[in-house]
C-alpha cells in the first residue's frame, strides 16, 4: 500500500462527530484522480472523479432526497400522516426511501418498468411502495401517473424532483463548495450527466462566477438527444436523458453538450472499474466517457476536468452493464 499523501497525513482519524441520523451523513464525497484510464485513451488532461456513491444510499440523489424532504418539513407542507408520491428513475426513489424511513413517512414511487430489479428491491427493502409504468412512455408516463395519484390520495404531496428548487439549491450549498474546496478552485471543466438537471445547475451557478473560464459540460444519451434538440428514444443509460427538458435546468450555465451512446457508456463504466478500481454505474460511464473525449482535445492538455460519478455499479447487476460477466 502506498504511503499516505502529505495532505492526508495531517488529518486526525475519524470524522470528529457522531451523526444524529443517517440523513446527516449525506455529502462530503471524495474526489479521486484517474491515474491510468486517461493515459490509456490518449487524454492529456487531469481527470478527477467525484464519487457520489459514497453517500449513504450510494448515489448523488441522496443529496436531493434529504434536501427536498427537509425543505417540505420546514415549510409545513408535510406531517406524520402525509403520503409522499414521486416519479423517479430509481436512485431518487432510493434516496427518498431512506430519508422517509428515517423520518417516518409513507412513500409511493412511480417509475418506468425498465428500471433495474436491484433498484426496485432496494426500494421495497426500505419500505417504499412501487408503481411501474410502461418503459416506452419514459419518465413522462411515470410523471403523469404520479400526478394522478396525488389528485386521488388524501394528504399527499409530490416533492417533484424535476421542479423542486431544493434540488439545485443543495448542489449550490454542498456539491459545488466541496468541488471548489477539494480542488482549490483549480478546475477547467465540470462534466455531469443531466437527469433532473439539479447537479449541473447548482454547481454551474456557483462555480462559473468564481472562475469565468470554467466550461460546464452536460452529458446526454446519444440515442435520446433532447437537450441538443433531438427526439426522445429509449436508451440504456439509467438516470439521465429523461426525455424532456427539466424545469429546474439552467441552460445558461451549460457551455457544451456531449452525446454518449449506451454502448460507450457501458464500455467506459467497465473500464473505469477494471483499470481504476472505481465501480460506477452506467451514467458514470457516460460522464467519464465525455471527460475522456474532452481530455483528448489539444486545447485540454494540462487542464483539470471534474466529472460526477453518480452511482454504484452494484445497482445495475441485472442490466447490460453486467451482461457476459
Where are these regions (language model features)?
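PLP-dependent amino-acid enzyme catalytic core
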Residues: 1-325
